[in-house]
Regions:
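Ser/Thr-rich low-complexity repeats and stalk/linker segments
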Residues: 3-4, 9-84, 338-342
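An acidic-aromatic loop/edge-strand motif
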Residues: 3-4, 77-147, 179-259, 327-401
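Surface beta-strand/loop "capping" patches
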Residues: 8, 16-21, 261-265, 285, ...
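Aromatic-lined ligand-binding clefts that engage carbohydrates, nucleic acids, or primary amines
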Residues: 25, 273, 277-301, 330-332
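Beta-strand-rich ligand-recognition modules
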Residues: 40-63, 290, 297-350
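C-terminal beta-sandwich/jelly-roll accessory domains of carbohydrate-active enzymes
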Residues: 42, 532-602
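Short, aromatic- and glycine-rich surface loops/edge beta-strands on solvent-exposed regions
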Residues: 64-74, 329-332, 573-579
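Catalytic cores of secreted or luminal carbohydrate-active enzymes
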Residues: 204-210, 218-251, 460-521, 539
């Protein structure tokens, strides 16, 4: 007999979309009657033959006064406490939407915005990879609501929270966030098998991945391979004990950053330093930027931190009493798995306590402890087609939202030529399944990249093209990324720009489209560019012209409400603005002083 339960999202702290009917769902014995008592009314539903029920609650006005929903079924009672009615948003995408508020901490900045608004709540859906083509859950298999004034608030989506805070400060209505973001997920990971099969591009992969036991077999193979690699490192490492004991094995003298090429295995770094007299050692942190791939860090032979992969910043708290007057040693091992690694350029390496610093840039000894063969990367399931559809994306279809916010595209840089098609299909299919024309606000990728291969420029161009989809908007984020970090910390401004787009699209009903170049008028020696609204040029280094496939920089200047380009070589095949991977200093701005999207035009 099926026990009476409510789906996980219908739990304490729930925010329901105002002014529309909401269906509250769960499970009960087939034929059982479920009743809801709320606000003096009673509403009912009956469980179907599969033991599922959908109980319709009529639309309610916005309310910041917490209330209770009381359910009864077969002698059992369930109560959802602390329920609000406001505006609910589906936030999704990759790690930059997933990135929690705690990861936006910048130890070199005095500004750190902490969440503190009880009217903003997030439901974090579990990330569950699934390649079964027939699996499509009606409800999330877990999850809970977090209030932004609670202990767990630092793990809420930073971009999502700052979006919600900006919006809440304007409209003063409770905000709910349903977060299905998954680091590294591709746009095709959020589409069902039958849609992916329409294109033919994914058939070979789907034939393999949809076979029973794919995840289990692949995981076992990966773990076996990675386990053998780790055991080889541990068995061959003869430097750990002497370095941690304070001995000084010979090695290469280096300063940070360090790039290691054509090497897989383990490297040790160590450095001795004097603790300055009067240095406030209590509360100190060891700051080592980011590295590739895995590190374990020590102060005076005691482990203070460990990070298993390349992306997170190495901010390690040093236990009080570990730093001592006089000589100290900082050391860390670095495991390089795939043939290239090192300590990332452009970061700051130091011990910090309050406003006091001990610089750690130079004076390191680098010792190669173990050399191995490059390891084959483990399978990153959630970056694959279909992976986060059936158990992570599909359960959102039955919920009511004000809009969807998506920050996604990094994983699709390698196939940017397909992105417009796949993103458009994602939006179309999502709207068809949820049954209404949900507004969709995308986040264009910011600047990033050590090597300019053009992949992110092409992806941004595809994202701009996706703005042709009706009832969509896009926040332009160049200028607030970090060239040497895939996860820039300025999510406050990301959230603010998303809120501006959302307000225009979903509230003011004016529509919202990024500023576009609407015309090119060629003159002797140059061209006049006109735009969909007045623009302001604050530099001239980002305009280029293409002649016979060769890209040449051209001078630009303000002319009226547009831009004039000097073209001494005549009419080009194409004109580009900021069309490269890392345009970190935007030069063209709209009437709101927001950056204009990179573009190209014939």
């Amino acid at each position: 007999m099926t026990k009476f339960t409510l789906d996980p999202i219908f739990s304490d702290g729930l925010v329901l979309q105002r002014d529309t009917e909401n269906c509250i769902c769960g499970s009960a014995a087939a034929g059982e009657r479920i009743t809801l008592a709320f606000n003096g009314g009673e509403y009912g539903a009956e469980a179907d033959e599969k033991g599922r029920f959908r109980l319709a609650l009529p639309g309610q006005p916005a309310s910041a006064e917490p209330c209770e929903l009381v359910f009864s079924c077969g002698g059992e009672t369930a109560v959802i406490k602390d329920v609000l009615f406001g505006d609910v948003f589906h936030i999704t995408g990759q790690s930059n939407m997933e990135l929690p508020i705690c990861r936006t901490f910048d130890p070199f900045s005095d500004i750190f915005r902490k969440p503190d608004c009880p009217m903003i709540r997030e439901f974090r859906a579990p990330i569950e990879n699934c390649f079964d083509p027939d699996t499509e859950l009606e409800a999330f298999d877990g999850g809970s609501w977090t209030r932004s004034d609670s202990d767990g608030a630092m793990f809420m989506s930073a971009a999502g929270y700052f979006f919600a805070k900006t919006l809440y400060d304007d409209i003063k209505v409770p905000i709910g966030l349903v977060n299905t973001s998954a680091g590294g997920s591709a746009i095709e990971g959020r589409l069902p098998c039958k849609i992916l099969r329409e294109y033919g591009d994914y058939d070979e992969f789907l034939d393999k991945a949809t076979a029973p036991g794919y995840i289990e077999r692949t995981t076992e193979e990966d773990m076996t391979r990675e386990g053998a690699h780790y055991r080889e490192l541990e068995a061959g490492d003869k430097l750990r004990e002497p370095i941690l004991a304070g001995e000084s094995p010979e090695g290469e003298k280096v300063s940070f950053p360090v790039e290691v090429k054509d090497f897989a295995g383990r490297i040790w770094f160590y450095k001795d330093f004097e603790l300055p007299e009067g240095f406030p050692a209590e509360g100190a942190m060891l700051l080592l930027g980011t590295m590739t791939d895995r590190d374990v860090a020590y102060i005076n032979g005691v482990q203070v931190g460990e990070t298993g992969y390349m992306y997170p910043p190495r901010f390690y708290h040093i236990p009080d009493g570990l730093l001592k007057s006089g000589k100290n040693r900082v050391s860390f091992l670095l495991d390089i798995r795939y043939g290239q690694g090192g300590v990332t350029v452009g970061k700051r390496w130091c011990i910090k306590s309050g406003n006091s610093y001990i610089d750690l840039t130079g004076g390191w000894t680098m010792c190669r402890a173990v050399k191995t063969e490059k390891i084959i990367p483990g399978t990153f399931f959630q970056g694959l087609p279909l992976s986060v559809y059936g158990r992570t994306t599909a359960p959102a279809y039955g919920l009511k939202f004000k809009a969807m916010l998506i920050y996604q595209g990094e994983t699709n840089g390698y196939n940017a030529d397909k992105y417009e098609r796949m993103f458009t299909r994602f939006v179309e299919y999502y709207r068809m399944r949820c049954g209404y024309d949900i507004p969709v606000i995308a986040t264009q990728l910011p600047e990033f990249g050590f090597v300019d291969d053009g992949s992110w420029a092409r992806l941004r161009d595809a994202q701009l093209a996706c703005c042709k989809i009706p009832n969509t908007a896009m926040a332009v984020t160049i200028g607030i990324g970090e060239w040497n970090d895939l996860h820039p910390v300025n999510k406050w401004e990301v959230g603010r720009r998303l809120a501006l787009c959302t307000k225009a699209l979903a509230y003011d009903k004016q529509g919202y489209e990024p500023v576009r170049c609407t015309g090119v008028r060629y003159l002797d020696g140059g061209a006049e560019l006109s735009f969909s609204e007045p623009v302001t040029l604050k530099g001239d280094g980002y305009f280029e012209a293409v002649y016979g496939g060769e890209v040449r920089k051209v001078n630009a200047r303000q002319k009226g409400e547009g831009v004039f380009l000097s073209l001494p070589d005549g009419r080009p095949e194409e004109i580009r603005y900021a069309y490269f991977d890392c345009p970190k200093d935007p030069e063209l701005f709209d009437s709101k002083d927001l950056p204009v999207s990179p573009f190209r035009t014939k």
